[in-house]
Amino acid sequence: NRTIKIEEEEKSSYMTNLIQTDATINPGNSGGPLIYPNGDIIGINTVKISTAEGIGFAIPINIVKPIIDSLKNNGNFEEATIGIYAYDKEVIPYINSSFNINLEKGIYVVQITKNSAAYNTELKEGDIITSIDSIELNTMNDLRQYIYTKKPGDEVKLQIKRGKISKEITLSLGKK
């Protein structure tokens, strides 16, 4: 249950609920399985801390199972996306203290990507997405795991909170 900060395109995002491992992860073997001694695959090796030797992180296998299933059944995986940067209650403590929000559940929309699925909807920066298709969201992994079961073009319903107002927004997922 580790969280790490990732710098991408002049933005910071966070990977949460990762498995910390001492397995060596290098550019050629990231994406490979993290295997338990009994032979079970428990994660996908993803990232290492470049300033520390022998510390790597893996995405838990349950999050990537929909991707694996799609690859096995269809030979490919098309990643769907809403097109947002968002934080959850697991990440907010890692952000500087000027980010003043008390988030008990849901995910906080920090930014909407231009020309994304969310861009021309009623979703706004500062909204809190509490559920997708009636499935409660508490972490970005909850959202990611659900989106991985969808295809670009699929329609989803987001329940959001904006201040004291609750509303439902329907959007068609984009392709990442």
Model-derived features: where do they sit?
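Serine-dependent protease modules
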Residues: 1-96, 102-105, 113-114, 121, ...
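Conserved PDZ fold ligand-binding element
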Residues: 118-140
